[in-house]
Design a protein with these regions (language model features):
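Bacterial Sec-dependent N-terminal signal peptides
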Residues: 1-21
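Short linear sequence motifs
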Residues: 6-7, 93, 193, 210
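A generic structural signal for solvent-exposed, polar alpha-helical segments
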Residues: 9-10, 29, 58, 80, ...
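Aromatic- and Gly/Pro-enriched helix-to-coil junctions and flexible linker segments
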Residues: 16-152, 239-243
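Beta-strand-centric surfaces of beta-sandwich/beta-rich domains
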Residues: 73-74, 78-86, 112-310, 315-329
């Protein structure tokens, strides 16, 4: 996660020029706007690009990755539909990076460089209304992935609408992703109490059918922010439960991930919900989903919305069988 100032003003009009682009005047603004959310010290990426020295050292990798379209990571086709929070470079920006590298990657005048973004690695919500922290958990060495669920202690005496939600991993290198749920049944707490270690293990969800998904974090993602006038209802007395996915590890690690939430203050809020609408069990129309070896089959699923609704986001997801997927919105 990040906190930065000055980047919103870092807009530059590139004109055709004979000289080689420089880091300070041409390249830094592109990198700060599209890359350093992940590529900073302590960020999701494995190397930093926040300084000229960083970028110069990795210049050939940066050129290759941007020319191939591998970076910044953005699987949706920008030519089909423009989506919110796109990480897409223009061809002009790609060419500027390539020309900079081919020209020896000069720094230029450092006084002309844009401000370096400040990454606190803490919170995009500086003053959250609610912070919930999981108990310290010792992640054991394992040859397989671990999906561990934790019930977080919160005080929520009344219904409130979430307008911002972020997950701050306690140990970024080992946290693959985090799902955030609310549970009004108390069943998650029962499962937690039955395990002598902090939390309990469950694959696919938190083991409570009635629980509602309210947030998702993956490396490089920003805080969830709802459209203006809309919010996700957090019910009074609900338990906040997170499922943390840890990959196979060869050493003992410690994690204490937390969730920050900001509530809406408008007198009227339109309710948002995150719901699975197409799956391989309930909505499949020509199941069951069984595929014999060396067989190719096509399946269909259909969902009819029970109410008039607005779709604000879509998130295709697969655990074990999926190799690739396409979604059209």
């Amino acid at each position: 996660t990040l906190f930065f100032t000055g980047i919103s003003a870092c807009l530059q009009f590139f004109t055709a020029r004979a000289q080689t682009p420089t880091w300070s005047e041409d390249v830094a603004c592109i990198v700060y706007s599209h890359c350093t959310t992940c590529h900073h010290e302590g960020g999701a990426a494995h190397f930093s690009l926040t300084t000229f020295t960083d970028a110069y050292y990795s210049r050939n990798d940066v050129k290759a990755a941007t020319e191939l379209g591998y970076m910044p990571p953005w699987p949706p086709d920008p030519n089909y539909r423009s989506l919110a929070h796109e990480r897409v470079l223009t061809q002009e920006e790609i060419d500027i990076i390539g020309s900079w590298v081919d020209g020896g990657a000069p720094e230029g005048d450092p006084l002309l460089a844009p401000p370096v973004p400040i990454y606190a690695n803490a919170s995009q919500i500086p003053q959250p209304d609610l912070t919930a922290i999981m108990e310290d958990y010792v992640v054991p060495p394992s040859s397989s992935d671990l999906y561990r669920c934790f019930v977080l202690d919160i005080d929520n005496p009344t219904d409130q609408f979430i307008t911002k939600l972020e997950v701050v991993p306690g140990n970024r290198p080992i946290v693959h992703h985090v799902l955030v749920f609310q549970d009004t049944s108390g069943q998650a707490q029962v499962l937690d109490d039955e395990d002598i270690e902090p939390g309990y293990t469950n694959f696919g969800g938190i083991g409570v059918n009635s629980a509602k998904l309210i947030g998702i974090w993956v490396p490089g993602s920003d805080a969830l922010e709802t459209p203006s006038g809309m919010g996700i209802k957090l019910f009074a007395g609900a338990d906040l439960v997170i499922q943390v996915h840890y990959p196979a590890l060869s050493t003992v690690e410690l994690d204490s991930t937390r969730v920050n939430i900001q509530f809406g203050t408008a007198p009227f809020m339109r309710e948002l919900a995150i719901d699975p609408v197409l799956d391989h069990v309930v909505t499949i129309t020509d199941g069951p989903l069984v595929i014999a070896p060396n067989e190719v089959r096509t399946f269909h699923a259909q969902y009819t919305a029970p109410i008039a609704a607005t779709i604000t986001a879509i998130g295709p997801h697969s655990h074990l069988l999926g190799k690739r997927m396409k979604a059209y919105a």
